[in-house]
């Protein structure tokens, strides 16, 4: 795929996965036993900053009905086919929740800059939200250098059964002394487990402090045991 096509694809996935309440991206596979999850590196994406960032589309999987797993070697081929066709297939039985994350590649600014770029991609993919937060997203990413890289954490949402929607809420706080330090907080995760045939959700929240101010981001994934 050409680089422009990759840009369009990443924008489409981010926009739908994080801003459409009923977004549903699934791959008709049955998952793989163990901790390893199928993923595909789609290349260097120019996101209009000083340098490109490596972006990875990761497909966490959750077997929903049975434990008959396919050969892991075919997973990447099917995902590649789905991406090359600009399509992400759906399945009634086996869901792949799409997470888009920045890889912790080597950078003089450490992982906080990479993570901030990842957040900027999410926000920047929706012009309406981006325009209400700031005029120049580049300035928002102007974070100071870190002495060492911290353990890179992704914004992950685990779904035990099925899922029916995802939404993200944003809140921009005015400049303050804390934001001038240019730090990011740890991700705080929490989930509400499913009860008997009822609905639940898995929620993550984080905050990024920068010279432009503080932005608080919360993502909630709703799911239902009836799916």
Swiss-Prot record:
What's a GO cellular component annotated to this UniProt protein?
A: mitochondrial small ribosomal subunit
What UniProt keywords apply to this chain's record, in alphabetical order? Mitochondrion, Ribonucleoprotein, Ribosomal protein
Coiled-coil boundaries: none
Cellular localisation: Mitochondrion
Protein origin, superkingdom: Eukaryota
One Pfam family, short name = VAR1
The molecular function terms of the Gene Ontology recorded here are: structural constituent of ribosome
Q: Which InterPro entries match?
A: Ribosomal_uS3m_fun
One of the GO biological process terms: mitochondrial translation
The entry's family comment says:
Belongs to the universal ribosomal protein uS3 family.
Q: What does this protein do?
A: Essential for mitochondrial protein synthesis and required for the maturation of small ribosomal subunits. Component of the mitochondrial ribosome (mitoribosome), a dedicated translation machinery responsible for the synthesis of mitochondrial genome-encoded proteins, including at least some of the essential transmembrane subunits of the mitochondrial respiratory chain. The mitoribosomes are attached to the mitochondrial inner membrane and translation products are cotranslationally integrated into the membrane. uS3m is essential for mitochondrial protein synthesis and required for the maturation of small ribosomal subunits.
**Self-association state and partner proteins as the record states:** Component of the mitochondrial small ribosomal subunit (mt-SSU). Mature yeast 74S mitochondrial ribosomes consist of a small (37S) and a large (54S) subunit. The 37S small subunit contains a 15S ribosomal RNA (15S mt-rRNA) and at least 32 different proteins. The 54S large subunit contains a 21S rRNA (21S mt-rRNA) and at least 45 different proteins. uS3m, uS4m and uS5m form the narrow entry site of the mRNA channel.
The protein here is known as Small ribosomal subunit protein uS3m
